[in-house]
Amino acid sequence: MRAETRPDFFFIWSGDRFSLLFRIAVSLVSCHHPDARVVVYVVGPSPTSVHFQALLEDGTAEVVALDPAEVLGRLPLALSGAADVYSRLPRASHAARSNILRYALLHDHGGVYLDTDVLTVARFPDLDGVDAAIGLETVWSGDRRRVSGDRTVWMSPTTCAWALAYSAVRCDSLLASGRLGVAGRIDRFGHAWTELQANNAVLASSPRSQFIAEVLAGIGEVDSAIRYSTGPTLVHDVLSGTNANVRVFGPDVFYSIPPGQSFRLFEDVTFRLPDSAVAVHVTASNHETRVARMSATDPCARPGTVIHGLMDADAGMQQGKGRVTAG
């Protein structure tokens, strides 16, 4: 089934574990864009969780049952290889399947795609006149080798430096709520073991976008058995070689916290989003137990953290108190 009109923002969901965090992600988009059409596409059976039911009842988004075969069938013949790859993916490969569907939907109707663990904190910039828009994220420089199965990455001196830095920041966040300032001190040397990579958790395009068409064409050339091969790795490689008019945002806009430090959103009371932040990627896959347990009375985050602040702000929004902000 297609949305009645072209959505301005859309999410894709499959599975039953629709948590409070994901409902808040949808609500925050509507909060900052009250006139926008927000769609949640559901693949397979609708979730039965109370949070999904709340989403249905509060009217912040249109929920649309999505038929992958129909969506992929609308792709031009030259891009039909993406449908072939999708059909070969195991049903449990939710992330890889979602990657392909988001590209197909963007190609079909354009708009802004967001992962359900992306929390909007400000109004999105005007993207008129661009073919597509994407954000860069700070990642460990050895991660691509790791996910491809290259075990020699663990013997690299930069990997040892990264592991020590991670451990120091993790201990400060867990034991001292970030008050020792370890992350700020280490960031000065982070260029030695990190690099910038495009991520597809936030992705915008016009209909029939050249960039998205190039991404869809590239799906048939990757090894879909390798994690991220249809996601960040693919969009980064395409971005590196495209001549399309793509607006590229720095990490401060969507990914101000590196995925390997996403625990700080729940634990570090000193971390603040930059003024330029439009959204923050929680990387919920790193916090599955915590995200599953989150409730209105227990945000599973320390008071003073970004997540706690957004939870409080969302509660205020639900009570009609106005615009959501976060520290």
Locate the predicted segments by residue.
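Short aromatic-hydrophobic micro-motifs that form the base-stacking/packing surface
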Residues: V112-L114
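Glycosyltransferase-associated regions of secretory-pathway enzymes
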Residues: M1-S98, T116-G327
